Amino acid sequence: MTARALWLLCLIVGWSPEAPVAERKAPPPHRKPDSRETPGPRAQPLPEFSRRPRAAYAGPRAWPDPRRRKTAPPADNRAGFRDAVHAPAALPGPRLAQAENRASPPEDSPRRALSRAVRPPGARAASPAHPNRPRAAAQPSGTPQALSPEDREPETQSCARACSADADEWEAYCASEFAVNGIVHDVDVLGAGMRLVTLLVDPDGLYKMSRLYITPDGFFFRVHILALDSSSCHKPCPEFKPGSRYIVMGHIYHKRRQLPSALLQVLRGRLRPGDGLIRGSSSYVKRFNRKREWQVRGATHTQCI
């Protein structure tokens, strides 16, 4: 009974408002570790900027008047303005000690001074020939000099006049043994002034055949013609361009027609009896056009004298 009463008494005293409340130890506030506790670089304190009083921001900001803004003076192109803008270069400083190790100036170099010496016009130092460069062969004194353009012009005009002479189709038709119209298929150069021409002729292009030897080749006929040029012109006469169409009138080669023995050795059986033969400007070789074809066809219906 005594223990129970003592326990109730203690309980009443503990819940009484007059009883002093036990002071509880509050935890220490959270703080950053000190520099002594954490190693490392120390944080620099931020500078404190002076703040303006709030009265300065009370009113609205006044924008400057553009009309009162001063305009920049126009740039002057005079020499005085450029001299004022560009400051003169500063005077060179004292020469350093390391400059003594530099190369000597160009005036002190004897090699450059020798190269700058005045040379007479046209004089050139003879340099040794390059070992891999072929030397130009010296022209003998007896060889003729090349013709100048003024001397070569009359010869060129005479060659062009002889090749482009307009021959009469009726006279050429009567003086020739064959007349064909064909496309140049191949031109074989046998030597100087010798060409073997192969023409592809359609049936309508055989104006005059006589004993001309032709070889069928599909829709066309192959005709071989030996063109001889005895002129000294740089351009062959007559001229045959592969792929072009020509009207050709000339003679027919046969065994009774004599040819130089040197020419026969070059041909070596490539020219057969019955092939065509034309000699320079004496034969008719012209580019095909409708007017010339009409005149040649008109000559086929006339009687030659």
From Swiss-Prot:
Composition skew (Basic and acidic residues), residue ranges: 21-39
Matching InterPro entries: Netrin_domain (IPR001134), TIMP-like_OB-fold (IPR008993)
Entries under SUPFAM superfamilies matching the protein: TIMP-like
Span of domain NTR: 159-304
Keyword Signal found: yes
Endpoints of the signal sequence: 1-22
Renumbered residue ranges of the record's region Disordered: 18-160
Disulphide bridges: 159-233, 163-237, 174-304
Keywords, sorted A to Z: Disulfide bond, Signal
Coiled-coil region(s): none
Family (UniProt): Belongs to the UPF0450 family.
Name assigned to this protein: UPF0450 protein C17orf58 homolog
Organism: Mus musculus
